[in-house]
Amino acid sequence: MSIKLINIGFGNIVSANRLVAIVSPESAPIKRIIQEARDRGMLIDATYGRRTRAVIITDSDHVILSAVQPETVAHRLSSKDEVNIDEVDE
């Protein structure tokens, strides 16, 4: 099994296998999702104090904020330059 990792900016990396959605933060429903995740303690802020440009939602209900454009994250997801970690069966 292969684990695909995606750079979401500033050296932060997430597992591509866990991503459900990559969305823009401007709409009211997404702002509500961010606030609810913050209240539940499920928000991960990877913006380093910069403007949030992408909101990444994972299958574990974590919400990750990134300063990278959603299109850039999606391009990295489909790119062949991903970092792959192969699990070795022992």
From Swiss-Prot:
InterPro entries: RemA-like
PANTHER family per record: REGULATORY PROTEIN SSL2874-RELATED, REGULATORY PROTEIN TM_1690-RELATED
Similarity-based family: Belongs to the RemA family.
Protein name: Putative regulatory protein NT01CX_2250
Gene source species: Clostridium novyi (strain NT)
Classification of source organism: Bacteria, Bacillati, Bacillota, Clostridia, Eubacteriales
